[in-house]
Swiss-Prot record:
GO molecular function: rRNA binding; structural constituent of ribosome
Signal peptide feature range: none
Protein name: Small ribosomal subunit protein uS11
InterPro entries, sorted: Ribosomal_uS11, Ribosomal_uS11_CS, Ribosomal_uS11_sf
Residue span of region Disordered: 1-27
Organism, as annotated: Thermofilum pendens (strain DSM 2475 / Hrk 5)
Gene3D superfamilies documented for this protein: Ribosomal protein S11
Amino acid sequence: MSEKEQKEVEAKESSGKAEERRETREKQVRGDVGIAWIYASYNNTIIHITDLSGAETIAFASGGMVAKADRDKPSPWAAMQAAARAAKIALDKGIRVVHVKIKAPGGYGPKTPGPGAGPAIRALVRAGLMVDRIEDVTPLPTDSIRKPGGRRGRRV
């Protein structure tokens, strides 16, 4: 065979492998899929895994469930432990793929997630869950919201 014919054969083989990979990935994604809701504030981190509709709770864990002291609840360590606990329960119940939705307090509170958001996602992946997409669902005010305390602030 000439070099040109050999390259054509290799191209056909490689495209077939790519199609196979696509098909196997689609099969994996179509399996049991859930949503991992991560609420990360500066006081705590809550991981809540539900089915795709969001109506049925599959697993739940928070930083307060694994931390011994209140000051440790929002820490990255507590978030990782809580995410690993929730992921283990979800894997036992048959969830393999999760869509991650991160939420910060929002509104008139902070719009950025707390320190446990990133480590929680990392722990979900390490526990064996496949993360399909990551989305930020922090509630943002569309005007008409005012900080508590009024115009002159909180008088102590």
